[in-house]
Amino acid sequence: MVSVKVREGESIEEAIRRFKRECERNGVMQEIKKREFYKTPSILKKEKLAETKRKIRRKMFKDSKWSK
């Protein structure tokens, strides 16, 4: 959980900016977006497999591009 204490002489706007920065660093928004909708284990497995295939394809493309 992210918490920010307002420092002495600090405006609320500055504290809010620090809070937003901390949320970004800790990946709070990414986690919220990830958990927004439930994905069944089979869908997660398919997505992971598709991502792996994409990475392999990219790597092969890069290798063939630079080997010429």
UniProtKB/Swiss-Prot annotation:
GO molecular function, one term: structural constituent of ribosome
Xref: PROSITE patterns: RIBOSOMAL_S21
GO CC terms: ribonucleoprotein complex; ribosome
UniProt-listed InterPro entries: Ribosomal_bS21, Ribosomal_bS21_CS, Ribosomal_bS21_sf
BP GO annotations: translation
Alphabetic keyword roster: Ribonucleoprotein, Ribosomal protein
Pfam family, one: Ribosomal_S21
Domain of life: Bacteria
HAMAP family cross-referenced by the UniProt entry: Ribosomal_bS21
Family: Belongs to the bacterial ribosomal protein bS21 family.
Protein's UniProt name: Small ribosomal subunit protein bS21
Native organism: Endomicrobium trichonymphae
